[in-house]
């Protein structure tokens, strides 16, 4: 794939996310308490296989040069992305259990799947804000003896998550920063007038 073709694929992905309502403008509160005028909710993607596959392909193109034999999606939205990557590129996947009942030995298992201590695992996520959810997943994997060196995400909201991961020894690779995403929306998408106005105002503060 040429750089021009990849750029077209990126713009196509953003346009489709806007079309299915995964990108919305307004007044929103993020899970970490921060306020924002643009909300990217990737949950609708699981109902759109073509969009899901495009995003999974873009994320996988970020993969590092070193050998990583496993991947794990951050629960829950990124599970579909990780599964899509696993099937499309034939790479093994493990599953982090978010809820532990502690009622039996089986329920105390943090990570499901076949793996060996010492293997390197890539953490896949849809959107990074504070970085907390990626760190929680990384810790669960590391507790089972896996090595976590990098995380691949679709969108970096540029609110400090990358620095948090770096401090923990994890390199972040993202398909889009929030600034890139908004620029793509403004230049390539037919936005509603109110959304275009909010996007234009937002880009001035990024």
UniProtKB/Swiss-Prot annotation:
Enzyme class: transferase
Gene3D superfamilies: 3.40.50.2020
Domain of life: Bacteria
Alphabetical GO biological process terms: 'de novo' UMP biosynthetic process; pyrimidine nucleobase biosynthetic process
Pathway given in the UniProt record: Pyrimidine metabolism; UMP biosynthesis via de novo pathway; UMP from orotate: step 1/2
CC cofactor: Mg(2+)
Pfam families named among the record's database cross-references: Pribosyltran (PF00156)
Purpose: Catalyzes the transfer of a ribosyl phosphate group from 5-phosphoribose 1-diphosphate to orotate, leading to the formation of orotidine monophosphate (OMP).
Self-association and partners: Homodimer.
Protein name: Orotate phosphoribosyltransferase
Gene name, Swiss-Prot/TrEMBL: pyrE
């Amino acid at each position: 794939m040429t750089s021009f073709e990849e750029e077209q694929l990126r713009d196509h992905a953003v346009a489709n996310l806007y079309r299915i309502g995964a990108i919305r403008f307004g007044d929103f509160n993020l899970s970490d308490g921060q306020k924002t005028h643009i909300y990217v909710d990737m949950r609708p993607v699981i109902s759109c296989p073509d969009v899901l596959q495009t995003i999974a392909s873009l994320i996988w193109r970020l993969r590092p040069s070193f050998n990583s034999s496993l991947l794990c999606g951050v629960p829950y939205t990124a599970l579909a992305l990780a599964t899509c990557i696993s099937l499309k590129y034939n790479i093994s996947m493990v599953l982090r259990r978010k809820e532990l009942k502690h009622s039996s030995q089986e329920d105390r298992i943090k990570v499901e799947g076949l793996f060996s201590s010492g293997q390197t695992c890539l953490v896949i996520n849809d959107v990074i804000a504070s970085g907390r959810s990626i760190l929680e997943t990384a810790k669960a994997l590391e507790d089972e003896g896996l090595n976590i060196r990098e995380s691949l995400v679709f969108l970096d909201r540029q609110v400090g998550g990358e620095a948090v991961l770096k401090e923990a020894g994890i390199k972040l690779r993202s398909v889009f920063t929030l600034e890139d995403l908004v620029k793509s929306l403004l230049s390539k998408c037919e936005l509603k007038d109110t959304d275009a106005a909010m996007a234009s105002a937002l880009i001035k503060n990024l």
